[in-house]
A protein has these predicted regions:
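Short, positively charged and aromatic/hydrophobic N-terminal segments
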Residues: 3-13
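N-terminal beta-alpha supersecondary unit
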Residues: 21-96, 102-109, 113, 128
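Conserved small/polar residues in nucleotide/adenosyl-binding loops
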Residues: 131-133
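Short, basic/polar N-terminal leader/transit segment immediately after the initiator methionine
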Residues: 3-4, 19-21
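Short, well-ordered alpha-helices that flank and scaffold nucleotide-derived cofactor binding pockets
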Residues: 39, 120, 124
Length: 133
């Protein structure tokens, strides 16, 4: 299920108002694999606890542009490590997360599928919601 920005804000504000929410974000729309952990402060403003990015510039340089199949393979190879680094750097544990967010578009479909599948797996294993961004 895809949520609009307003629906996401309402879900966070109305349904989960009891604590400072911690969300793991996953990005894989093109040629960078990224994971970030954010937590809202007392004024409900998101604070970035970690932001880890792995670029694929060198992978695609010789082709003069992004090759979707190579980009997707690189995401598959790196997404676990990037996510673990983001969690470690943030100082939180997976059990502390309140939701998982992953890029749903726009982007290269094969790349988006990697991040969404990974996000869905993490969310499912922790019994959390997956927010499509």
């Amino acid at each position: 299920m895809l949520y609009s920005y307003i629906e996401i804000v309402l879900l966070i504000k109305i349904n989960l108002m009891k604590k400072k929410h911690i969300i793991l974000g996953i990005e894989s729309s093109c040629d960078e694999t990224a994971a970030s952990v954010v937590q809202e402060n007392d004024q409900s403003i998101p604070i970035i606890l970690s932001n880890i990015v792995s670029s694929q510039v060198n992978v695609h340089k010789e082709f003069g542009g992004v090759v979707p199949e190579l980009a997707a393979r690189s995401h598959i190879e790196k997404i676990d490590l990037i996510t673990k680094k983001a969690i470690d750097e943030s100082g939180v544990k997976f059990k502390d997360l309140d939701a998982i967010a992953a890029t749903a578009g726009p982007g290269l479909i094969v790349c988006l599928a990697v991040g969404l599948s990974f996000g869905k797996s993490v969310a499912s294993s922790l019994n959390l919601s997956l927010i499509h961004i």
